[in-house]
Amino acid sequence: IELQPDIVFIYIGINDVWHKYNVGTGSDIDLYKNGLRKIIEDTQATGAKIILCTPTVIGENSGEFTLVNNFKDIETMEAMNQDLEAFSDVVRTLSLEFNTELLDLRKRFKTYISQNNGTNASKGILTYDGVHLNNVGNKLIADEMIRFLK
C-alpha cells in the first residue's frame, strides 16, 4: 500500500486451508473473512482498483493422494476442498459487497483440470506437488490477470 499501486490483485487462502490440515496452523473461515475484509478496506482507502481472486486448488484429482510428501486420505481431501469452496464463496461475497472485480481462479483451475486430467493425476497438471504452481499453472494465472490490465 505504501507504494500507492493503481491496481492490486488479492490472491490469498490456499495456505489458510492447507496448513489447517497439514500443520494445524491455518485459519478458520471467520478469521479469513475478517482478515480479507480488512485488507480490502485498507486497499480501497488508497483508491487502488482491487481484483479479488479466489483460492485455486489443493490436489488435482478426486480421491486420496500424497500432498507435498504428506499422505492425505479421501475424507481429508474432501474436507479441504469443502473449505476451499467456502473460502472462495467468501471472496465472491466480499467482491460483491465492496464492488471489486472478481477473478474466479478456483473455477478456472477446476475447469482446466477437468479438461486436461484424464488420468486423475494428483499433481502435474497445474501444480508440481498438488499445491505449488508449475509453469502451466503460473501461466494460466498470468494470462487471467493480464485480461484485467488491458
Residues of each region from the PLM?
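Alpha-helical cap/lid subdomain in secreted, periplasmic
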Residues: 1-150
